[in-house]
Each structure stands twice: as structure tokens, then as C-alpha cells.
Design a protein with these regions (language model features):
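Short amphipathic alpha-helix used as the core "switch/output" element in two-component signaling
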Residues: 40, 61-75
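Two-component/phosphorelay signaling modules centered on CheY-like receiver
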Residues: 11-36
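C-terminal output helix
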Residues: 87, 107-120
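Acidic, metal-coordinating helix/loop segments flanking the phosphotransfer/catalytic sites
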Residues: 31-49, 57
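The C-terminal output helix
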Residues: 117-131
Length: 132
């Protein structure tokens, strides 16, 4: 069964590009344009990995909020921030919230796909060894 990747990105063109590129790598992709839309989708099923933008529409810290909410549900869920907010304080905040990676935009789709693959392998190894 294909691993499930969720992308939360308010820019429709970027969201479509990421979803297309990731699905071509064999993943099942759910794409959301807002925090509220994503939470509704996550109520139905949590993905295996989440990619979050921080600014979603008018909500300047929506990605941070969403990360908190997701990790409260599933503490071992791999979360990647993919954002234009690249100040060190934002990176520190994202990592302290529990994100596994913090990537700046723009990013090549190949590199993003490799980060996803790498983090899923790490998570799978953690699951097999029982490491929390």
C-alpha cells in the first residue's frame, strides 16, 4: 500500500505542483489549502507524513498551530515545514514544535521527494525497533 502524504499549502499552483510530483513517486497524496480543510481531512485519516506551509491565507502561524494539533494526536508523525519563512527564529520554533525538517522555498521537487523518502525510512526503522 502506498504511503500517504498530506500537503497543506494555500497557493493552489504550488499545492498542485507538489501533489503531482509526489504522487509520481508512488505516494498517495492529499492536498489541502487551509488549516481548517486539513483538520477536516485529518479527522478522517492521518497521513504517514505531513508537509506544512506556515502561512495559510490570513493565518500567519497556521502551520505552527496545525503541527501542534497533529503531534498531539500522533507524536511520531513526521512533519516537514516547507515555507518562505526562513528566519532562524521560525526554524527554531518549527523544530521545537516537533517538526522533523524545516525546508525553505523554493525547493526542487526532486530534493523534496528525497527528503520525504528519507524521513519515511527513518520512521519505519523507528517503528521496527520500538524507538520513540
Amino acid at each position: 500500500m502506498a504511503k500517504r502524504i498530506a500537503i497543506v499549502e494555500d497557493d493552489p499552483d504550488q499545492r498542485a505542483n507538489y501533489a503531482d510530483a509526489i504522487s509520481k513517486k508512488g505516494y498517495s497524496v492529499s492536498a489541502y489549502g487551509s488549516r481548517v480543510e486539513a483538520l477536516s481531512g485529518f479527522d478522517a485519516e492521518l497521513p504517514d507524513l505531513v508537509i506544512l506551509d506556515i502561512i495559510l491565507g490570513e493565518e500567519i502561524d497556521a502551520g505552527f498551530q496545525l503541527c501542534r494539533e497533529l503531534l498531539a494526536r500522533e507524536p511520531n508523525l513526521p512533519v516537514i515545514f516547507l515555507t518562505e519563512r526562513i528566519d532562524e527564529i521560525d526554524k527554531i520554533s518549527g523544530l521545537r514544535l516537533g517538526a522533523w525538517d524545516y525546508l525553505p522555498k523554493p525547493i526542487t521537487l526532486d530534493y523534496l521527494a528525497e527528503r520525504i523518502s528519507s524521513l519515511l525510512r527513518i520512521n519505519e526503522a523507528r517503528d521496527k525497533t520500538g524507538v520513540q
